[in-house]
């Protein structure tokens, strides 16, 4: 009977110890699986930073529940990650310079602490008073406010803090002292504001030099101001005046100008871009070709003569426009504009492709709904064409009687019309 009682006691002790000891074996397992295991074992909520990636290898036959957190942090730090904060905790890149961490203690100092407080050779992790809280962002992207919120938190406390964004639900996750988090909603209300959108309408066109382009019915009585303060009644006078290449106009100059250009045989519309972008965000549009350019060639003794090779780099050649608008409180728009009109040259003087480039880059201040005229970029094209009677033009001496050569010079000027309109946030 005594022997049976002893056996039952030993069995119960084995079951009891097994229920508390944690056994884990992971070989090159994803780090997020290790985090999931820890969360299930402890019941703690854990937020994983987007830059936390990699694998872990862990073999442990006996991890007591009271040591799980320290064991988990030790594994994270061995892989250059760490867990900070609480309720919930945040896993991020390990920063040994943070005030939340201290250096690894020597063995003589570790003996002064309870052996159950940390695994042998591990770290002592002091508890801090940070609280983790989430904040819903309603009008802008949460990730755009990270630096602003970090500045607010760090300017109000010297303690460590962390700010992360959850892009899927547009949340900010902030780990900081509680008094800072209590004041954060009031600060967020001053930066989480609706953002206006700006509609950019453009017209890129060429006019042959010397041709009078009639914009009289297009511009009509639409008055404008040429840069420099000179008033004008018609867009025509700006284009035809000596050196006139930019001005600011009110009214529907852009739409009416498109009609005028379509009826003129000496003008050519290159592009009519339309871009809608948020205030403070870049928008761009382009159309053209992706042209290969030879950047290197290997032949002769340094390469296989039967299989020479060359390196090629592709670049976009065509019409493009990029804008960076900012809507001001008074109804003005500060606009960064870059417009390019590139083309392939027909010249055969070079061994590779030749491109003609014309570009405009500037920063202007417009009123809502105004139209800006930029331009004055002149392009010269000299072309020669040989023609003759087949066979007869190839006969020496007398062949000149049956052939001819014609030379032509073309000169065109590039203009860009840009209209900016604020689309108010609802």
Curated annotation (Swiss-Prot):
Q: Chief subcellular site?
A: host cell
First and last residue of the signal peptide: 1-21
GO CC, sorted alphabetically, is: host cell membrane; membrane
Where do transmembrane segments lie in this chain? 317-337
* Keyword terms: Host membrane, Membrane, Signal, Transmembrane, Transmembrane helix, Viral extrusion, Viral release from host cell
Instruction: List the subcellular locations.
Output: Host membrane
Q: What is its membrane topology?
A: Single-pass type I membrane protein
Gene3D superfamilies for the chain:
3.30.1370.120, 3.55.50.30
| Organism superkingdom | Viruses
Q: Which GO terms describe its biological process?
A: protein secretion; viral extrusion
The reply to whether Transmembrane helix figures as a keyword in the UniProt entry is: yes
Family from the record = Belongs to the inovirus G4P protein family.
What function is annotated for this protein? Acts in the assembly and extrusion of the bacteriophage by forming a channel across the host outer membrane. This channel is just large enough to allow a newly synthesized phage particle to pass through. Extrusion is a process of concomitant assembly and secretion and takes place at specific assembly sites where host inner and outer membranes are in close contacts.
Quaternary assembly: Homomultimer. The channel is composed of 14 G4P subunits that confer a barrel-like structure. Interacts with G1P; this interaction results in a complex that spans the inner an outer host membranes.
Protein known as: Virion export protein
Q: What is the lineage of its organism?
A: Viruses, Monodnaviria, Loebvirae, Hofneiviricota, Faserviricetes
Could you tell me the gene encoding this protein? Answer: IV
